[in-house]
Amino acid sequence: MILNVEVGFDDLNTTYQLRSQQPHDGQVQQQGSRNIPQLSLPMSPVARPIQRTTQILSHLQHTMSAHHPIPAAPWRSAFLSHVDKMESPTFMLSTLHHRGSSVTPRSRTVVYRGAWAEIPVNPKNQAPLNPSLYESDLLTITTDARMEKVPELSTDGEDIPQSGGGGPVEAVFWVVETKTQWRLRGRAYLLGQDIDDPSASHVRQEIEKHMRLKNNDDSGSWNWGKEITAHFGNLSPGMRGSFRNPPPGTKRDEKPAPGLGLGQKVEDLDDEIARRNFRVVVIVPEEVDQVDLSDPEDGRRWNYQLKDGSWEKTELWP
């Protein structure tokens, strides 16, 4: 018996096909306009074609989530407007630190680097940019892969060699200009140099759910690796050089490895050492709390929760 399955659809400006020509070939071949993960379907000689169909449909359901993204969050416009007013867009990022069987909170100040897929314009950035095709409700920061917070972004406290994560985080902004506090709780994902590889497909899929086409225009070509390089290029040479620092948290009297040292400036956007340590962190909010204290006699508070693919808004007492 021969099972033929053919599917065509657009996924982030990608059209590709799935075909099974033989019932026991063990793999679905993929063809497309960009590198996409291979779908391996190991089957025993007695496996029935319906099992193959079930696996293919499961894969399609996961991939098609990017074609039907989650609608824009009702808090998005106000949040972006408030952050734009900040003299320095910093916030507190809280994570969970695992040590043996104990879990303790960790917090640090980080710099907001814009919404994912909407990198802020920097005329000094020499990196090639993706076309402005998408918008999202996702926050971005940059970090060093050697930082202690990297394993804290995983679900189990284990280190993340490249792309991965999904651990719980909370981001807290105090916007003094509007006297508003924003707390965003959700999951954080680390994006490394392997982001276009099949091994990082689960990270891309989680983020793609929140990427919405602007004006239904998918005529351009958008690339994940290019977006990460653009974030690296948006940093100053001195900030890029910080990714050639000695390993954070190591003893000062330990001699750093060749090429590492403080105070370096990096002009080359493909600097091997700096890029090896550079990561983009994408925060996917699942709950947002907004407290407006601009009127001391009538404070306002709203809670937003992402449930079943849509946002629910509730007004609360502050």
Language-model segments: what does each one mean?
Residues 44-318:
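Binding-site signature for planar aromatic cofactors or substrates
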Residues 1-42:
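Intrinsically disordered, low-complexity basic segments at termini and long loops, enriched
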